Amino acid sequence: MISKINFVKMHGLGNDFVIVNKRDLSSSYDLSQLAKNMAERHTGIGCDQFILYEEHNDFYEMIIYNIDGSSAKLCGNATRCLAKLIYLDTGKQDITVMVGNKKLLCNVNDENNISVNVGSVSFNEAWMPSRDKVWEFAERYMIDLKETICVDIGNPHVVIFSKLEPQDQKIVGERLQAKELFADGVNVNFAEVKDNKIYLSVWERGVGLTLACGSGACGSFAAGLKHGFIHSPSTIVFKHGNLTMKEENGNIIMQGAATLVARGEYYCEQ
């Protein structure tokens, strides 16, 4: 039997999403498999991540799937996209999004200016691998550990301020997913600082290299502040646009654009 699923395609600075309202899905769907199928760029719609959302009394619940069908704990760009979608559909400008237990406070100033307060970050190193393993890995790829930091923004990130060539970023991003280093994988941020701006590329676990990463921007901004490399406010620069970042009372606030690409119907065999 073929069923029809309404979807929205959006992107945040090139980081693209297929977004589906959970009310449009029956309980019979294998959501992990559906995410993989719709994310496939040749036989599906194509995206970096598949987003489900559901409206509750005073917040919207967001569930994130990677292209490999695994779940993600946070996505800043998807949050901005969802906030814009809700604004377009309802006119609401102040929107609360819940991802698991994390509350994200969103404000849509206008269609191209959406801010997200992602809250505080943690530099607790309990989830890091042993220092011996890290040193061995760092020496192999000439990474300066004094310029490397782990940060949890709701999902785990490693931020590397040592300059690496694009081909080396791919290798390092892939190999840091090794179970003996990070049991559940890790998002890897390659950051270069110039004039209080961070030029950033990100290897997202479960996805690979992406054109932009909102949670990576937040984690890298927080890491840059901790190292003293930048001050607040600052700018995160991606290939297809920038995010403005600031810190207020220990909270990280991200601001930038989100783009509506298409609305459509996906036909799914069950």
UniProtKB/Swiss-Prot annotation:
Presence of the UniProt keyword Isomerase in the record: yes
Annotated binding of substrate, by residue: N15, Q49, N66, G76, N77, N155, N187, E204, R205, G214, S215
Highest taxon above the source species: Bacteria
Cellular component annotations (GO), alphabetically ordered: cytosol
Active site location: C75 (proton donor), C213 (proton acceptor)
Pathway annotation from the record: Amino-acid biosynthesis; L-lysine biosynthesis via DAP pathway; DL-2,6-diaminopimelate from LL-2,6-diaminopimelate: step 1/1
Marked site positions, Could be important to modulate the pK values of the two catalytic cysteine residues: H157, E204
PROSITE patterns documented for this protein: DAP_EPIMERASE
Keyword annotations from UniProtKB, A to Z: Amino-acid biosynthesis, Cytoplasm, Isomerase, Lysine biosynthesis
Name of this chain's protein: Diaminopimelate epimerase
Species of origin: Rickettsia rickettsii (strain Sheila Smith)
Lineage of source species: Bacteria, Pseudomonadati, Pseudomonadota, Alphaproteobacteria, Rickettsiales
Gene that this sequence comes from: dapF
